[in-house]
From Swiss-Prot:
InterPro entries: KOW, Rib_uL2_dom2, Ribosomal_eS4, Ribosomal_eS4_C, Ribosomal_eS4_central_region, Ribosomal_eS4_central_sf, Ribosomal_eS4_KOW, Ribosomal_eS4_N
Protein name (Swiss-Prot/TrEMBL): Small ribosomal subunit protein eS4y
Recorded family membership: Belongs to the eukaryotic ribosomal protein eS4 family.
Entry-linked PANTHER family: 30S/40S RIBOSOMAL PROTEIN S4, SMALL RIBOSOMAL SUBUNIT PROTEIN ES4
Chief location of this protein within or outside the cell: cytoplasm
Any one Gene Ontology BP term: translation
GO molecular function: mRNA binding; rRNA binding; structural constituent of ribosome
UniProt keyword list: Cytoplasm, Ribonucleoprotein, Ribosomal protein, RNA-binding, rRNA-binding
Locations listed in the record: Cytoplasm
Protein origin, superkingdom: Eukaryota
Domain called S4 RNA-binding: residue spans: 42-104
SMART domains on file: KOW
Amino acid sequence: MARGLKKHLKRLNAPKHWMLDKLGGAFAPKPSSGPHKSRECLPLVLIIRNRLKYALTYREVISILMQRHIQVDGKVRTDKTYPAGFMDVVSIPKTNENFRLLYDTKGRFRLHSIKDEEAKFKLCKVRSIQFGQKGIPYLNTYDGRTIRYPDPLIKPNDTIKLDLEENKIVEFIKFDVGNVVMVTGGRNRGRVGVIKNREKHKGSFETIHIQDSTGHEFATRLGNVYTIGKGTKPWVSLPKGKGIKLTIIEEARKRLASQQAA
């Protein structure tokens, strides 16, 4: 007889983008319930131990967290399996470091180092807009936030710029043709480009056609697209490569060129 949720996660069943080696043990950290889906997040233990290399063991990670050194979106987090996700800001005041979680073009999480000024805000995609008791309007964001009394012009799929200190909407970006977006799901995850056109299919998924800065075009579902700036200028700094996916041949040529230069 089943008794509630599974408390364990086998390593082979963990998401591929966590990049855990097969022979590193039998189990992987099971993410706690939180603002991001378990298959679309990166637990804090993996950020500190596997990515930043600030700890060698699980126990060392717990020690760092219990000293309240790690902040996610401006709040101290002590849960070792807290699910940090796309666009979250991970701050370590002790070392004066800030990182934003973004995707690389292979669909894996990249801890992108950012300045203090950029760590004060994050971009949140609007999931839905509803009315509560007494007709009070509120919006829900992709990371589980509820914000009351938003601007009436904000609609679902738009992106809001959220001040993390005051938890207030500073600005917003309309989900429109001509704006720069990042793909957050599917085979094109991590790619950045400008929306060229929207294809509406009644009773099915809306298709978005995107063109990257090299002129390559690709298409994806509406749910996979996340607006990150107005026009062609993103509001957040992007990791190395700027979201341009290279072909296998282009990657090989780039590798050869770097080897010859070295």
